[in-house]
Regions:
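Intrinsic-disorder-associated, low-complexity terminal segments enriched in Asp/Asn/His/Tyr and depleted
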Residues: 5, 13, 22-25, 42
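Alpha-helical substrate-recognition element adjacent to the catalytic core
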Residues: 37-186, 279, 283-287
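Short linear segments in intrinsically disordered or otherwise low-structure-confidence regions
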Residues: 30-33
Length: 323
């Protein structure tokens, strides 16, 4: 067994060592070296700005609700029929629309003899359609950020199902998928809602991203006071993407705290276009763009310009602090 000397000098090293003790006790000595290396790497990355791109999913990255690309058909219903029944449950019980659709999925799958295990949700997720350019989008933006000295991270903040999103072709692109999910029994089958995310619950994940907290369960660290300089992703470094009015609380918070909110819309659906224009007119978002994520799109142009602005402001602030 080797000994560990935590008595380094310097404010930064003391901070590293404070975290190191915790990591050592949690991980054990064999994993300690890897853990402390990762910690030092994270602190090093803070020398360059981290920009968080946070996306709603349904209607934002995909042209429809994820349940409409295989699951609803598998239970023998039409999308309109399924959502009407879900709304009736919510209205009749004065219940959450999110918990109502999760219950309906569970009940209808059981009637149809369909098992709902993680792998089953992922299989349905693999059929979810995406807007033009979405698959290539992450590589394009990551590369642009790298060329500007910026680290880009991607997050999902959705009222859809995390398990289905995990089955999509783009799941690996996200640092964290914040979304609804089920609790599973010993046989691996869904038996109860584990996380339900409605339009106001979404806002908590902005503050978790802000402080670098990836756990859904955590309700302590996210509420602890933290100096602005220590927050992993400042709000001005956030870009929020959403298609509708259910994302308004998140869009408004990000915009209010100096970040940028983008209302994306399907140009083929007039109602979606009108909603986006309304949000811009009401100053709830900074920009509106068609749901096109190709390199030639307005979305790409807007996001690259925001990244440029973030980097310039970051460099100016650092110069102002230097002697």
């Amino acid at each position: 067994m080797f000994s560990l000397d935590f008595s380094f000098s310097g404010r930064k090293n003391r901070k590293i060592c404070s975290h190191a003790r915790d990591i050592y006790y949690i991980c054990g000595e064999r994993r300690f070296i890897v853990a402390i290396f990762a910690l030092k790497y994270d602190l090093k990355m803070r020398k360059k700005p981290i920009v968080a791109l946070i996306y709603d999913f349904d209607g934002t990255l995909s042209p429809g609700n994820m349940q409409e690309f295989g699951f609803i058909q598998a239970i023998g219903k039409k999308p309109q029929e399924f959502w009407q029944e879900s709304d009736e449950i919510a209205a009749g019980q004065d219940a959450s629309n999110i918990l109502s659709y999760m219950k309906l999925m569970f009940d209808e799958a059981r009637k149809a003899g369909i098992k709902l295990r993680r792998e089953d949700f992922k299989r349905f997720g693999a059929s979810v359609e995406l807007f033009d350019g979405v698959k290539e989008w992450f590589g394009l933006i990551n590369e642009y950020g790298k060329s500007r000295g910026v680290k880009v991270e991607h997050y999902i903040n959705s009222s859809g199902l995390a398990e289905m999103i995990e089955g999509t072709a783009i799941a690996k692109e996200f640092k964290r998928i914040f979304a609804c999910s089920f609790i599973y029994n010993k046989d691996g089958e869904a038996e109860w809602p584990g996380v339900a995310v409605d339009y106001t619950a979404k806002t908590q994940f902005l503050f978790k991203i802000n402080k670098g907290i990836l756990s859904v369960r955590d309700n302590k660290k996210v509420n602890e006071s933290q100096a602005e300089d220590n927050k992993r992703v400042p709000f001005p470094h956030m870009i929020y993407f959403g298609d509708g009015e259910t994302d308004v609380p998140c869009k408004k918070i990000v915009k209010m705290f100096g970040g940028n909110s983008i209302a994306v819309y399907n140009p083929e659906i007039k109602k979606k276009v009108n909603v986006a224009k309304k949000l811009l007119r009401q100053e709830r978002v900074n920009f509106i763009t068609p749901a096109d994520y190709t390199k030639e799109s307005r979305t790409y142009q807007v996001v690259c310009s925001i990244i440029d602005k973030i980097k310039i402001n970051f460099d100016l602030a650092r110069l102002a602090r230097s002697k």
